[in-house]
């Protein structure tokens, strides 16, 4: 239920899970989406596509980032979350950690993991296959859905309440991530390439920086 375990010790967690034949079911909405897209698939994938809202400063020019406040960083445009993860979302540190998490959960090299800005947070993630087909998992930004999926898998819970309305979301947009504006994303990818304790060091540095 936390990504840091896989960020700092993914190699050991996944090795132990394999030895004990213990499946790991993701709860993060992005990784739950990928998992759901992979259920029943036997063919290798071309890439994983992880989406992100862009956080509180998505529409803010780079030159104005030096003047932002903590209060501004805590205003996430889509999700209601704790303070630490909301700050990490504003810097895309959280998304970088999710790339590391996806690498360990699905055995996908960093070169085959793409991050796209998706302001509406409706498409939670996608999987592209070698034949060009892309599967996506869509839904409102509500953590109850990935949590219930993990708890009930392989069945699905019956959830009362309002259903997703496509007419209320007529436009879904996507864009590439500005790596200069969000350097933490590339740092996380580089940690994966370096292996060893690099990701653990990044996590520790971020814990101190955000505290």
Language-model features: where?
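Catalytic, metal-anchored helix/loop core of enzyme active sites in primary metabolism
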Residues: 1-211
């Amino acid at each position: 239920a936390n990504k840091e375990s896989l960020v700092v010790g993914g190699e050991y967690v996944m090795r132990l899970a394999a030895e004990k034949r213990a499946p790991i079911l993701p709860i993060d909405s992005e990784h739950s989406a990928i998992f759901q897209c992979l259920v029943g698939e036997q063919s290798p994938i071309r890439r994983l596509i992880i989406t992100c809202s862009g956080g509180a400063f998505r529409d803010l020019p780079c030159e104005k980032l030096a003047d932002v406040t903590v209060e501004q960083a805590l205003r996430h445009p889509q999700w209601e979350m704790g303070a630490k993860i909301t700050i990490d979302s504003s810097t895309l540190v959280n998304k970088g950690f999710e790339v590391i998490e996806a690498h360990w959960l699905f055995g996908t090299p960093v070169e085959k993991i793409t991050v796209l800005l998706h302001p509406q947070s409706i498409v939670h993630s996608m999987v592209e296959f070698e034949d060009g087909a892309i599967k996506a998992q869509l839904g409102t930004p509500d953590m109850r859905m990935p949590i219930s999926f993990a708890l009930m898998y392989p069945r699905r819970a019956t959830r009362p309440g309002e259903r997703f309305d496509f007419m209320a979301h007529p436009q879904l947009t996507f864009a590439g991530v500005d790596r200069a504006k969000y350097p933490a994303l590339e740092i996380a990818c580089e940690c994966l390439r370096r292996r060893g304790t690099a990701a653990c060091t990044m996590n520790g540095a971020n814990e101190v920086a955000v505290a």
